[in-house]
Amino acid sequence: LEMASLGSKVLQIRAVEFAQKYEVPLRVLSSFEEGEGTLITTEYGADKTMEQALISGIAFNRDEAQLTINGVSDTPGVAYRILGPISDANIEVDMIIQNIAPDGKTTDFTFTVNRNDYQRGMEILQQTADKMGASEVSGDARIVKISLVGVGMRSHAGIASSMFETLANEGINIQMISTSEIKISVVIDEKYLE
């Protein structure tokens, strides 16, 4: 499910959701070569336990854009006041980062949206910034999200560390990080994708 939702384009996400919900095994086959492909089931082995972290795939999504609003007063409800108008415009938000400034009075808020919604999102965010007295609005439509997908990703610190080390060794700066039990995602400059 994570691979499909992250843009791997191997399976249609609704097919994966139904297979997961009703425990229907899925077999993924290559259209380029013969073979048995990959069988996706709910069983994890004879005892159905997951002892080790296992990377099952790497996915990327280049259809993302990043929006940032800086210098917003850090008060309860700030996330709603920023994302409410974005949601009202039917723009889906993916990754979110909120940083409190050292003065403890203001916050910076960054989030990602689909690249097709970038211009509209920037316009809405600028209107929101004007109402909230924010110091700056910025954006970047040249980003890509890279995700490692597998079992036990968050509970095995070595996986994230290895990913970050690999990117650092290649001189690639990480702009955003998101983790869950089954994925680690980073946002980087699009020029590093290939």
Positions of PLM-derived features:
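C-terminal catalytic "cap/lid" subdomain
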Residues: 1-179, 183-194
